[in-house]
Every structure is written in structure tokens, then in C-alpha cells.
UniProtKB/Swiss-Prot annotation:
It catalyses: a 2-demethylmenaquinol + S-adenosyl-L-methionine = a menaquinol + S-adenosyl-L-homocysteine + H(+); a 2-methoxy-6-(all-trans-polyprenyl)benzene-1,4-diol + S-adenosyl-L-methionine = a 5-methoxy-2-methyl-3-(all-trans-polyprenyl)benzene-1,4-diol + S-adenosyl-L-homocysteine + H(+). Signal peptide: none annotated. InterPro entries: SAM-dependent_MTases_sf, UbiE/COQ5_MeTrFase, UbiE/COQ5_MeTrFase_CS. Its EC number is 2.1.1.163, 2.1.1.201. One of its GO terms (molecular function) is 2-methoxy-6-polyprenyl-1,4-benzoquinol methyltransferase activity. The gene is ubiE. SUPFAM superfamilies: S-adenosyl-L-methionine-dependent methyltransferases (SSF53335). Methyltransferase required for the conversion of demethylmenaquinol (DMKH2) to menaquinol (MKH2) and the conversion of 2-polyprenyl-6-methoxy-1,4-benzoquinol (DDMQH2) to 2-polyprenyl-3-methyl-6-methoxy-1,4-benzoquinol (DMQH2). This is Ubiquinone/menaquinone biosynthesis C-methyltransferase UbiE. NCBIfam families: MenG_MenH_UbiE, PRK00216.1-1, PRK00216.1-5.
Length: 249
């Protein structure tokens, strides 16, 4: 089997054709406790990262937004308020379990009039060219098998002048933070997953997938190669997370 035939699933090398199913099993397992675990793992800081993302989105009333890997709907909820009744937000997720949790939570909280729910693969988005004013993907790109293809798809469905937002775990810029983060990721996260979600292996994969994700400069270059311009990134919490932005010319 050649290098082109395999890809990483955490630290493991698996056939390209199998990664999607491996990732699906992880998110089928964690869907019900996903929001609780996010709060515990980040001590609530993920809400600040997402708020920063919204602030950088430039989304206004009447806009059309695609939230890829939208999961339980954190960003979708915020975009829904911004675009208002004249706008539209599409929450897309490849995982049916996550999509169902997101749909239920949003509808239970009175959202839905301007939201569509679509099960979709980021590598083959089921939307026409030039469909959206903004495309976001938060903590989802690292789980995609072919990240370059996914970025090309995001660029394709953006309207000219539209903005892509990629919020993802990245590489800490402070050596002390980096060392502490490693200890936390590989010790505390699996333990927390075992105690709260009865699933340590999925959270071990989370830690490994973060380490395998491209660093800030590499992801910026990948976005440029996908056809986006004005690409930049913002390091959050000493680079533990980075928000990358790019614009379609």
C-alpha cells in the first residue's frame, strides 16, 4: 500500500477509504455529551474562541452562511441571529448523530426559521458555485481526509468577496504552554472522556488528531493554494487555537 493510499487517523495510518468511517464512529460515540465535554475540556474558553470567530466574520443581516461540521450548532445559532429573517444559515455535518443533536437543540431553543440542516461531506459540498457570503468550519477540518479538496470546495461555494473562517486547534507559540498542553491533552482528556462520556479512546484520538493537524503557516498556504486571497490567522490562547480567514476574489 503506497503513501497515497493511506492517511492518518490520529497517530495511526489507515487506508484513505476507511478514515471517514473511523471518524464517524468517534462522533457517533461522543455526540450526546459533545457540548458538556467541550465546556469541561476548554474550561468554557471555546465560547470565547467562537465569539471571536463571529466578530471576524463580517456577516450582516440578509447574508447566506454555510457552517460546515456545524455539529451541535454553536456557530449556527450566532449566525442565525446575525443574518435575521431575510438571511439563511445552512448547518452541514457529515455525521448524522451530530446533525440530529444540533437540530434538536436549535429547535428546542426556538431557532430554525432561517436555518437549514444538511448532511454533507466537506470534500464534495452539494451546493452550486458562488452560493454563500460566508463559510465557516470550527474544529472540523482536522477530521477531514482530504483537507486540500475540502478547502477547494469551500472556496468554490463562496461568492466573490465572501469569507472563509477556519477555527481549529493549532500549534502553541509559547514553549511552556506547549509542554503543559501536551501533558493535559494526553493525560487529562482521555481520563475526562472515560469519566464523563465513558469513552477514553475517542478523546485520545482528539489529542492525536490535533497534533497531526497542519500548523498555522502551513494551513495559511493551503488556503492560498485553494484559491483564497488575503489569508491571515489569529493565534488564540497562545496558539492553542488559531482562526484562519481568507477571501474569495
Amino acid at each position: 500500500m503506497t503513501e497515497r493510499d493511506t492517511t492518518h487517523f490520529g497517530y495511526k495510518q489507515v487506508p484513505v477509504t476507511e478514515k471517514e468511517s473511523h471518524v464517524a464512529k468517534v462522533f457517533d460515540s461522543v455526540a450526546a455529551k459533545y457540548d458538556l465535554m467541550n465546556d469541561l475540556m476548554s474550561m468554557g474558553i471555546h465560547r470565547l474562541w467562537k465569539r471571536f470567530t463571529i466578530d471576524k466574520s463580517g456577516v450582516r443581516a440578509g447574508a447566506s452562511v454555510l457552517d460546515i461540521a456545524g455539529g451541535t450548532g454553536d456557530l449556527t445559532k450566532k449566525f442565525s441571529r446575525l443574518v435575521g429573517p431575510s438571511g439563511k444559515v445552512v448547518l452541514a455535518d457529515i455525521n448524522a448523530s451530530m446533525l440530529q443533536v444540533g437540530r434538536n437543540q436549535l429547535l428546542d431553543h426556538g431557532y430554525g426559521d432561517n436555518i437549514e440542516f444538511v448532511q454533507a461531506n466537506a470534500e464534495a459540498l452539494p451546493f452550486p458555485d458562488n452560493s454563500f457570503d460566508c463559510v465557516s468550519i470550527a474544529f472540523g477540518l482536522r477530521n477531514v481526509t482530504d483537507k486540500d479538496q475540502a478547502l477547494r470546495e469551500m472556496q468554490r461555494v463562496l461568492r466573490p468577496g465572501g469569507r472563509l473562517l477556519v477555527l481549529e486547534f493549532s500549534k502553541p507559540t509559547n514553549p511552556i504552554v506547549s509542554k503543559a498542553y501536551d501533558v493535559y491533552s494526553f493525560s487529562a482528556l482521555p481520563l475526562m472522556g472515560s469519566l464523563v462520556a465513558q469513552d477514553s479512546e475517542s478523546y485520545r484520538y482528539l489529542a492525536e488528531s490535533i497534533r497531526m493537524h497542519p500548523d498555522q503557516e502551513t494551513l495559511k498556504s493551503m488556503m492560498e493554494q485553494a484559491g483564497l486571497c488575503l489569508c491571515k490567522y489569529y493565534n488564540l490562547t497562545s496558539g492553542v487555537v488559531a482562526l484562519h480567514t481568507g477571501v474569495k476574489a
